Structures are given as C-alpha cells and as structure tokens.
A protein has these predicted regions:
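Short beta-strand scaffold segments in enzyme catalytic cores
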Residues: 93-97
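Nucleotide/phosphate-binding catalytic cleft detector across ATP-hydrolyzing
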Residues: 1-88, 102-216
Length: 216
C-alpha cells in the first residue's frame, strides 16, 4: 500500500482507513466484534515509528496487546530455535538471527516487493498499479522473474552483509516477495547456506503475529 513506505507509516489517516475497513470485513465474516489484537514491526525501526504503527491500529478500534518484530513472528510458525529468518516484505528486507531460541540480532533495509513493482513499471512503461497486477499474474511469472531477479540478488546481498561474523547454517525465507518459484535459488547461490522456503510464505508472518500473542 502507498500508506507505508520502507516500513514507515507515511499516510496516517490512509493507514487507519485501510485497517478499519479490514477490521469491518473480518468482523462481518466471523460474526464477532474485534476489540483486541497484536501487531508487528519491521526489525530495527525507531521507537517513533513503532508508536505510529500502534496508533494506527488503535485508532482503527483495536487495542494492541503486543508488538513483535516481523521475522521473529515468523520464527514462531517455523518452530526454529537457531538460524536466520529473512522476511521479504512489501517495502523492506527484515532479518532476525536466532541462537538457542533467542533473537541475537535484527536488521532491516528498504528493499522489498515494492521495488520489484517499480522495476516492472519502468520495464513495461506502465503505472505502479498496473505493474503490481503484472507482478502477481501467474501466467507471466517466468517473464517477471527474469526482470526482478536483480532485486532478489540485492536482497540476498543484504542478508549476506548482516550475517557475516555469525555462525549460521540455515536461512528461512518468508514474505510475499519470495513467492516466486526458484527465488530461494538466488539466495543459495549468494549465501552458500541451506535455504528453506515454506509453503505459502506470504502467510507465515501474519500467522506468527497471532501466535506471538498466545505466548504470553
């Protein structure tokens, strides 16, 4: 969405409107009122940005009970205690290094699915929304993958930069930006480590956010 840029809320009222709409749609489907919830942040964001994200959710009528960073949330679903969780999101690449069940390092850089869309917009000479449709069109996946490969290579380089000096063997990819078939092979080539990508990686972090609240 355009209301968030590089993991930071840039359109406060627009973000509230989107969350409120999603809340209403979910309440209608479930037949219940949603009053409490959990939220997540990109790793390493400033405290001011954390407050902004919480304020958006609470302004939409949801009392935030817990905030967790996105890669850590994903680790709850993956059930891992050691390794690197890489969350390839819409605006950022988030990294969490776990050792003996504890997060020992987190980092985040502004490269994600949005940057893939911008590459496609320039390549096809279309606007952002049309490029987004092209990116998610399964019929064009092979063609699109060729063009967004440099973005994935940059993401892999970001991970390599941050995990240098840490003894890790396993890297777990989650997030919508790694949904492309063979995206994990780019990371294997760059990192030379064991790369794992779960089924439907786009849903791993959201489920992890819910599980984070259950750990209290």
């Amino acid at each position: 969405s355009r209301v968030v840029k590089d993991g930071i809320v840039v359109d406060f009222m627009g973000a509230i409107s989107i969350v409120r709409k999603l809340k209403e749609e979910l309440e209608e489907k479930l037949g219940i009122e949603i009053t409490e919830g959990y939220t997540a942040i990109p790793p390493g964001v400033e405290q001011g940005s954390v407050k902004a994200i919480v304020n958006v959710v609470e302004s939409a009528g949801i009392d935030v009970k817990k905030v967790v960073d996105e890669p850590t949330a994903a680790s709850y679903v993956l059930g891992i205690s050691d390794g690197v969780v890489v969350d390839l999101g819409g605006g950022t690449t988030g990294i969490s290094i776990l050792k003996d069940g504890k997060v020992v390092f987190v980092a985040d850089e502004p490269t994600g699915g949005t940057h893939m869309t911008l590459v496609l917009a320039g390549s096809y000479g279309v606007d952002f929304e049309t490029a987004e449709d092209i990116k998610t069109d399964k019929k064009k996946e092979k063609e699109v993958f060729t063009q967004i490969t440099p973005v994935l290579e940059k993401m892999a380089f970001i991970v390599k930069k941050y995990i240098k000096g840490y003894k890790v063997k396993d890297v777990f990819l989650v997030g919508g930006a790694c949904s492309f078939a063979d995206s994990e092979k780019i990371f294997e080539k760059e990192l030379g480590l064991n790369i794992y990508k779960p089924y439907m990686p786009i849903y791993i972090t959201p489920i992890g956010i819910a599980l984070a609240g259950m750990k209290d």
